[in-house]
């Protein structure tokens, strides 16, 4: 759909250049700020539009066919945001939406996160072993971790968020993060990251409520879909539906729980998991953790042990549990 056919603002009219070289952060942000005033959607037309951090402020994005929103390869283009993650520290992201509702990112275009530009891809992090690795095993190992944007597409404290139809590729770290969000829909996405990049998880839901993930194809160097309470241990992650997805992970295709997390009311159905170090993983690895009311049905799980420092040993289903005592950390 062209910008003129709907209530949309075309970033080109604000001076953005889709040549794959020009840094368009200020131009695209100006379009977003204008749309925040009018209630319109920002349209990314065909072309490769390079950008640093963009703050959505509740504005929706539409990516037309042939559109590529390409993340800058320069860390200086990702200034620190007003958010500190419990595990990943100060937020440096490409797309940020903090505390704004009713955001949709859709279309048939691509978000290219330029992940490999933050790694030396000529080197592999081969663990010490008494048995020498074959070249095939070395090829499966991670790149050494470097400095990189931490969470590429980041939503916090937001309601009514929909991502539909787009393609997201080459993340340097977590691809999509939803923290303390409500009514989230991720439908028909393709997420394709380099399988040698450590921590380039597909989707993280942290302390969220009311989530639907359907008809997605996710290939990642770490977890494809992770459900936890890592950003707010005292708030449960609940009412989650995952269905009709194809998942391929060097770590865990789907992981439920982590340290103190409280997870409840999760259904997983009609998914294919293949070439994964672990299929389904349940982690209640602290006395304060709780996972309850989870139903899994109609799954095909095909695992394969991958060399290197990945989590897992080819288990289709893995459970880590300790006795729950209802303690929640301060």
Give the predicted meaning of each segment.
Residues 1-330:
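Extracellular/periplasmic carbohydrate-active domains that bind, remodel
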């Amino acid at each position: 759909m062209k910008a003129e056919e709907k209530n949309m603002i075309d970033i080109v009219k604000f001076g953005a250049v889709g040549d794959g070289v020009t840094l368009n952060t200020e131009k695209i942000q100006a379009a977003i700020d204008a749309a925040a005033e009018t209630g319109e959607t920002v349209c990314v037309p065909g072309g490769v539009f390079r950008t640093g951090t963009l703050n959505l402020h509740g504005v929706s994005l539409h990516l037309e066919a042939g559109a590529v929103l390409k993340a800058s390869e320069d860390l200086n283009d990702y200034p620190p945001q007003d958010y500190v993650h419990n595990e990943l520290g100060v937020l440096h992201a490409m797309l940020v939406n903090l505390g704004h509702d009713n955001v949709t990112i859709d279309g048939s275009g691509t978000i290219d996160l330029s992940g490999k530009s933050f790694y030396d891809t000529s080197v592999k992090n081969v663990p010490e072993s008494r048995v020498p690795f074959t070249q095939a095993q070395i090829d499966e190992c991670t790149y050494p971790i470097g400095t990189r944007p931490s969470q590429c597409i980041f939503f916090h404290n937001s309601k009514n968020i929909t991502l539909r139809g787009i393609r997201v590729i080459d993340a340097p770290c977590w691809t999509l993060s939803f923290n303390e969000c409500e009514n989230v829909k991720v439908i028909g996405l393709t997420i394709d990251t380099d399988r040698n990049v450590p921590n380039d998880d597909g989707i993280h839901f942290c302390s969220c409520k009311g989530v639907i993930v359907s008809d997605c194809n996710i290939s990642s160097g770490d977890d494809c879909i992770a459900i936890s309470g890592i950003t707010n241990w005292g708030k449960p992650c609940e009412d989650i539906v995952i269905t009709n997805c194809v998942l391929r992970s060097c770590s865990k295709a789907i992981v439920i729980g982590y340290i103190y997390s409280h997870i409840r009311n999760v259904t997983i159905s009609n998914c294919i998991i293949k070439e994964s170090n672990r299929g389904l993983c349940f982690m209640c690895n602290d006395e304060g953790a709780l996972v309850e009311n989870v139903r899994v049905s109609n799954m095909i799980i095909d695992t394969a042990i991958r060399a290197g420092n990945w989590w897992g040993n080819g288990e289709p289903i893995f459970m880590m549990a300790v006795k729950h005592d209802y303690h929640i950390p301060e």
